Amino acid sequence: PSKNAQEFFSRDEKIVDDAFIQNANEYLNSQKTDPAYTRITSSFMRAFDGKPKLEIPINGKRIFELREYQSHNELKALLKVQMFNEGEIAIFNATGLKSVFFGQTLIGPDIPNLTYMLVYENQEIRGKNWQAFLKHPNWDRMKNMEIYKDTVSKIVARFLDPAPYSQV
């Protein structure tokens, strides 16, 4: 996560920071025969007006869910961003879905898309909160609004465990 474009473009300089090196020792010293990853994919996103800053609402043991909503054209993608800004984020908050960030992908794979991250203490809480979201009367109203029909053509969800050196 970066506060601005300059911070984003200077991100590699942080790798030589002593604290980062200490916390990421296992990762940075992984062997070619047992790499920490296959390849890295990066995206440049614009934060949503409804959640302009990254937050970490839960510390300690937790799981992250990274969700990507792909759209079949740019207009539908913008309408889905609007849907979040005009009510869906508020429904998340009301039903216990704790968000880390929401971003519209400007540069990256599979555009047009938006990506957001949620955090939970465990899978059981995740299930309860999503059920509350699906039953919320404002969600039922919003999802049936004509303007928001067919805004998402594909959803990709990934579950992540935070590493000791993770910024989130």
Cite the ranges covered by each PLM segment.
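Short S/T/G/P-rich N-terminal loop/turn motif that feeds into the first structured element of a domain
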Residues: 1-139, 148-168
